[in-house]
Amino acid sequence: MFVKLLRSVAIGLIVGAILLAVMPSLRKINPIAVPQFDSTDETPASYNFAVRRAAPAVVNVYNRSMNSTAHNQLEIRTLGSGVIMDQRGYIITNKHVINDADQIIVALQDGRVFEALLVGSDSLTDLAVLKINATGGLPTIPINTKRTPHIGDVVLAIGNPYNLGQTITQGIISATGRIGLNPTGRQNFLQTDASINHGNSGGALVNSLGELMGINTLSFDKSNDGETPEGLGFAIPFQLATKIMDKLIRDGRVIRGYIGIGGREIAPLHAQQGSGMDPIQGIVVNEVTPNGPAALAGIQVNDLIISVNNKPAVSALETMDQVAEIRPGSVIPVVVMRDDKQLTFQVTVQEYPASN
């Protein structure tokens, strides 16, 4: 055994000597160059610029109510966040943050504290507008009306979770146009995986430039099977939030048009066809409110609405949003297909019953 080992070693040495004689370049060992990195010359990826632009305009909101068991003392009932929208002192928050409040306190990040006036609130969008009377300038949230949120955009959620103090969480826009999360709601939610916890409601969802993208409003605490989902937060798009704010400031409430129908849209390939006509896209009526505007005009369940107020009826939500912008009392044409016949009804728009 030992002799075999010596023989193997000797053969290896002989082969190595031959290779070195034939290929002298093998004698040179080139050292591996290790790149030198001076960390002082590089800037780490950061969203500090966005935070510095937006965070001062995000405030803490405290809902205080009387506690009859504590000698009618005011105690904090709920807490949330809000966003200062302009120098006049108007602040957007969620309605559920200030529900049943006897007093609303707003705390700014610079240490100033104000008692806020409730300008108005809207149940369908879960939005409320507050006003503070501040001397001196106020930080306001940057808004770029030309900016449209897109899936994949980096976003930061700013708020006061669990009253820990202002906190920033980061994620992306996971989806846009989410509907059906609130059965009576009118929101087209932005979905994000940025953490939105208790106390973040009413805070700001901003992009990497610090521009307002939405108002944080809810997250899923538990699914139907008891699991706690992660990365499911939702925000109301800033376009809708600012529109509701303007209406609340102007009227003290949101006045919406209403024609009293419910329906679902159908794709052209599945639509009814009239004799010699191309497929028709529209909204199938599945509910007509008794004595509502549509019922009084003659519209029935199973009618196929193809246009409302001279605009094609493509999406049920979009059509209802268009009707909501029409002043109550206006008369609008609604075109439907019924039994392969096209009918036009004149519908008098009423005010949505839950506008107050």
Curated annotation (Swiss-Prot):
Principal subcellular localization: membrane
Highest taxon above the source species: Bacteria
Active site: 96 (charge relay system), 126 (charge relay system), 201 (charge relay system)
Phenotype upon gene inactivation: Loss of heat shock but not acid stress response of sigma-E regulon. 10-fold decreased survival in acidified murine macrophages.
Membrane topology: Single-pass membrane protein
GO biological process: protein quality control for misfolded or incompletely synthesized proteins; proteolysis; response to temperature stimulus
Gene Ontology CC: periplasmic space; plasma membrane
InterPro entries (UniProt xref): PDZ, PDZ_sf, Pept_S1C_DegS, Peptidase_S1_PA, Peptidase_S1_PA_chymotrypsin, Peptidase_S1C
Pfam families given in the database record: PDZ_2, Trypsin_2
Catalytic activity: Acts on substrates that are at least partially unfolded. The cleavage site P1 residue is normally between a pair of hydrophobic residues, such as Val-|-Val
EC number of the protein: 3.4.21.107
Domain notes: Deletion of the PDZ domain eliminates the heat shock response of the sigma-E regulon, but not the acid stress response.
Quaternary structure and partners: Homotrimer.
Extra remark: Regulated intramembrane proteolysis (RIP) occurs when an extracytoplasmic signal triggers a concerted proteolytic cascade to transmit information and elicit cellular responses. A membrane-spanning regulatory substrate protein is first cut extracytoplasmically (site-1 protease, S1P, this enzyme), then within the membrane itself (site-2 protease, S2P), while cytoplasmic proteases finish degrading the regulatory protein, liberating the effector protein.
Biological role stated in the UniProt entry: A site-1 protease (S1P) that cleaves the peptide bond between 'Val-148' and 'Ser-149' in RseA. When heat shock or other environmental stresses disrupt protein folding in the periplasm, DegS senses the accumulation of unassembled outer membrane porins (OMP) and then initiates RseA (anti sigma-E factor) degradation by cleaving its periplasmic domain, making it a substrate for subsequent cleavage by RseP. This cascade ultimately leads to the sigma-E-driven expression of a variety of factors dealing with folding stress in the periplasm and OMP assembly.
Protein name: Serine endoprotease DegS
